[in-house]
């Protein structure tokens, strides 16, 4: 079978700490197929963006591994979200991450009825 990881990104980030980060990052990097669900809904910070997300995406880009993203944000909005940290508006680190997202994924807008409550 194919190793697939569906990761609710905000939950992953909220559960992540410095001590367990390397183990999680290596496991996610090794997945044959990765789906990062609800990216952009997490509490962003520079460490998560630069040391977690960028490292995962860089590996997946270099290995040409299938990577999917779901988000309520358009690419431009996601870039702005990634730029906003407590320290400042860090547009260049966010642009580096977004270059990897754009390499790995094509933006597709899905519209329709929210069926979560049906």
Summary of predicted features, one role per range:
Residues 1-34:
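AAA+/P-loop NTPase substrate/partner-engagement loops
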Residues 6-7, 35-37, 66-72:
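Structural recognition of the conserved hydrophobic beta-strand(s) that form the central parallel beta-sheet
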Residues 38-42:
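Short, basic, glycine/proline-bearing loop/turn elements
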């Amino acid at each position: 079978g194919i190793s697939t990881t569906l990761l609710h990104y905000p939950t992953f980030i909220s559960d992540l700490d410095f001590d367990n980060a390397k183990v999680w990052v290596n496991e996610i990097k090794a997945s044959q197929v990765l789906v990062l669900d609800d990216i952009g809904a997490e509490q962003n910070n520079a460490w998560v963006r630069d040391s977690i997300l960028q490292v995962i995406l860089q590996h997946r880009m270099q290995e040409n591994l299938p990577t999917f993203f779901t988000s309520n944000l358009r690419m431009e909005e996601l870039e702005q979200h990634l730029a906003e940290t407590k320290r400042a508006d860090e547009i260049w680190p966010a642009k580096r991450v977004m270059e990897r997202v754009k390499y790995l994924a094509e933006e597709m807008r899905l519209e329709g009825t929210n069926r979560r409550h049906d």
